[in-house]
């Protein structure tokens, strides 16, 4: 298991990753490697045909001062593509009103392969094409992404 957290409030632009900048629980097996701020490499190094991981994302998010109050969302991305089932949406009633999101995805990596995993601010208004998404959100410090090998 490995866990990475943010140490300060972050302004994250639409379709960008959350910068996890501190290792809370290090991975001692070499299966999870941070390669960039907010991007993790997960390895499928195993004697089996695959390695399976549970990736959990949690944190508090809000529309920053000066932003438009719309639905905001975070999702888990694998190799840059957001997993639709992992998108967690929060609809604030006012600017700077924080809401907690928690989501997870199960990711299967074939033996000998790797995948990049990240948490991304995505459009929470895509069900309403007439609404323009907020260009950026605030992600409160102590947001975390946890990677746990389950098979």
Enumerate the language-model features and the residues they cover.
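Extracellular jelly-roll beta-sandwich "head" domains, especially the C-terminal globular C1q domain
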Residues: 1-151
């Amino acid at each position: 298991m490995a866990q990475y957290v943010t140490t300060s409030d972050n302004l994250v632009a639409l379709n960008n990753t959350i910068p996890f900048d501190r290792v809370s629980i290090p991975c001692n097996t070499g299966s999870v490697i941070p390669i960039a701020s907010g991007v993790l490499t997960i390895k499928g190094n195993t004697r089996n045909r695959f390695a399976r991981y549970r990736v959990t994302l949690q944190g508090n998010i809000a529309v920053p001062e000066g932003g438009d109050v719309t639905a905001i969302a975070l999702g888990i991305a694998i190799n840059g593509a957001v997993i639709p089932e992992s998108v967690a949406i929060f609809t604030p009633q006012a600017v700077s009103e924080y809401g907690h999101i928690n989501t997870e995805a199960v990711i299967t990596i074939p033996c000998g392969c790797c995948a990049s995993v990240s948490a991304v601010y995505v459009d929470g208004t895509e069900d309403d094409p007439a609404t323009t998404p907020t260009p950026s959100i605030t992600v409160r410090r102590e947001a975390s992404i946890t990677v746990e090998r389950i098979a």
